[in-house]
């Protein structure tokens, strides 16, 4: 999935940041990386059709497409700080992405990926009804 969907730098950096939040401990490496793939696609401004395709694919595999599916319906300010300290730290792989990486930009990309996931799940439920 990762090689086709986005660079693995952002995906694994997001995973590493998520591991700083104890509430994500029950979730597997691949589940956290899946959400990182979505964040990486948003960071890289992937075409809309590619985003839809990856959301469908991850959902079909029962992988998380929202933060809530990773046990994070909301994050505290401290959780965001811990996550971003790791995901955007000076030695983080995310700096291999082809754009300037900022903590605010990564947070916004994660929030957008989460919002898109919620919208996707809402529209998927409607089409199954």
Located regions from the model:
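C-terminal charged capping/lid subdomain of soluble metabolic enzymes
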Residues: 46-129
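Active-site segments that bind and position negatively charged phosphate/pyrophosphate groups
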Residues: 1-63, 68-69
């Amino acid at each position: 999935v990762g090689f086709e969907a986005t660079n693995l730098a952002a995906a694994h950096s997001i995973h590493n940041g998520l591991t700083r939040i104890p509430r994500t401990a029950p979730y597997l490496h691949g589940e956290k990386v899946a959400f990182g793939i979505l964040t990486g696609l948003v960071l890289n401004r992937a075409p809309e059709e590619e985003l839809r395709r990856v959301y469908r694919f991850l959902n079909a595999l029962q992988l998380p497409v929202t933060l809530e599916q990773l046990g994070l319906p909301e994050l505290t300010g401290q959780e965001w700080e811990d996550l971003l300290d790791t995901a955007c730290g000076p030695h983080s792989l995310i700096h291999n992405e082809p754009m300037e990486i900022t903590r605010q930009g990564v947070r916004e990309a994660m929030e957008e990926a989460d919002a898109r996931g919620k919208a996707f799940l809402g529209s998927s439920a409607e089409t199954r009804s």
